[in-house]
């Protein structure tokens, strides 16, 4: 059985950057679960089809492959909008839950898998050998998101970013299905006062103690 590393946490906590580095270091396959709904939505949008069409969206979700996640248009606004439409369809959510579990159980490289998201350790892969909950203060996360936006040339105000972050935290933490909470057996990694290298070293230490 391959090793599964589940990484959860709120927005801008650094979990995506950390997950990619860990996968590269360990020779594991990486799944950015945030892209899978975008990939399904864009499969339809590219073909001129409506992502809100239940039957079409469910079929696209069932046919999703890891190669679809390499598409270069998954970060554009249209992809986010398409993702929002398909994500509201229960059949799509069920198919993509199966996709994530298959990827984790039988990763393409065969050695192991790193998945990051909101509910990997609690819902998608509760059997994961290593579970990390990566977090940081909401103020620090807002600072990081503001910097990301500015580096992309997008104008943003700290107060607005902070308010949006708090609203998203509230929504993620209190939703009825798969709320954002650490798994009972997850190691919590607070990156508020850590740079990327320090967070990476801390995560490697946790993984080493669990394997």
Swiss-Prot record:
Q: Where in the cell is it found?
A: Cytoplasm
Q: Where does ATP bind?
A: 9-17
Please provide, alphabetically and separated by semicolons, the GO molecular function terms listed in this UniProt record: ATP binding; CMP kinase activity; dCMP kinase activity
Name the Enzyme Commission number(s) assigned to this protein.
2.7.4.25
Q: Per its UniProt record, what CDD domains does this chain match?
A: CMPK
Protein's GO biological process: pyrimidine nucleotide metabolic process
- The main place the protein resides is cytoplasm
Give yes or no: UniProt keyword Nucleotide-binding. Answer: yes
**Keyword entries, A-Z:** ATP-binding, Cytoplasm, Kinase, Nucleotide-binding, Transferase
Task: Tell me what reaction this enzyme catalyses.
Answer: CMP + ATP = CDP + ADP; dCMP + ATP = dCDP + ADP
The record's Gene Ontology cellular component field reads:
cytoplasm
| Similarity field | Belongs to the cytidylate kinase family. Type 1 subfamily.
Note the NCBIfam families from the entry.
Answer: cmk
The protein depicted here goes by the name Cytidylate kinase
What is the organism of origin for this protein?
Paramagnetospirillum magneticum (strain ATCC 700264 / AMB-1) (Magnetospirillum magneticum)
């Amino acid at each position: 059985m391959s090793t599964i590393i589940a990484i959860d946490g709120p927005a801008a906590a650094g979990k995506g950057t950390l997950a990619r580095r860990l996968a590269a270091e360990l020779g594991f396959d990486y799944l950015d679960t945030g892209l899978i709904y975008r990939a399904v939505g864009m499969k339809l949008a590219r073909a001129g089809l409506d992502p809100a069409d239940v039957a079409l969206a469910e079929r696209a979700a069932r046919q999703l492959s890891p190669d679809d996640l390499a598409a270069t248009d998954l970060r554009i606004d249209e992809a986010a909008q398409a993702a929002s439409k398909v994500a509201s369809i229960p059949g799509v959510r069920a198919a993509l839950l199966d996709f994530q579990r298959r990827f984790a159980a039988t990763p393409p490289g065969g050695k192991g898998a790193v998945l990051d998201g909101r509910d990997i350790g609690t819902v998608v892969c509760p059997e994961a050998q290593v579970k990390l909950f990566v977090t940081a203060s909401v103020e620090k996360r807002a600072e990081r998101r503001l910097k990301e936006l500015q580096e992309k040339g997008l104008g943003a105000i700290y107060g607005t970013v902070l308010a949006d972050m708090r609203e998203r935290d509230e929504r993620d933490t209190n939703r009825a299905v798969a709320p954002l909470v650490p798994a009972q057996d997850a190691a919590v990694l607070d990156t508020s006062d850590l740079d990327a290298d320090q967070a990476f070293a801390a995560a490697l230490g946790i993984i080493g103690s669990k394997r």
